[in-house]
């Protein structure tokens, strides 16, 4: 089992030193990856539509510090040279696909081939409206933009003729260090997300999903891979688990966090994830201050991680 640390680039704490301290601790303790999340802003008035909590509440406010994920990873890539650099997840329809591909490939080149592209469609209508992106078309746009990303990374003369975007007559260099492209880990666990992972993903990366539900979804994913003519064994299964906490439920979104309680409880849950096919867990550490989060990380290493 590999482990990553989710960094609070969407947070109420002072971001710069917190992100750097946590990334350096992740490197010191030999975590496999560090991860950031994606929003451009949080509205002052937000409907309770967050799909990964029982209440629909996001748990962030409009005045929290919201840092761009790609810029943040570029900053951290120059400070830590061990862990892979993941986005959990980049909301694909928010940004121009060519510019996004250029930023991702640049980061992959400058970091020595460490990028993991977690890819999602987004869920917040208010954010789509402000960015003048189509919420209704977000799934189809995501599919096209991911195809464009792969085309730009691999083709000598990239071309694409889609419903929402077309490219031709352009050179796209350099190509990424990772071949054929940085791995795409598709987020979400709706049927559409699973179908997307089966079609275009190098991995599947749902968030805040319990082991039993994940195991059921893996069975569905394997069937969809067979329909798409792909070997399901070639897809890496990962999951992000937020609010990792010792000694309590970790409950901040209306239901207990899967990785909470005693060290033995957490170990047992990790084993259930592993039995379901998970090979990489991203830990979202609960805490209001960096020192508190670092204590939890160190305790996880001492008492839980093999």
For each of these PLM feature ranges, what is it?
Residues 1-306:
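Active-site-adjacent structural elements that line small-molecule/cofactor binding pockets in enzymes
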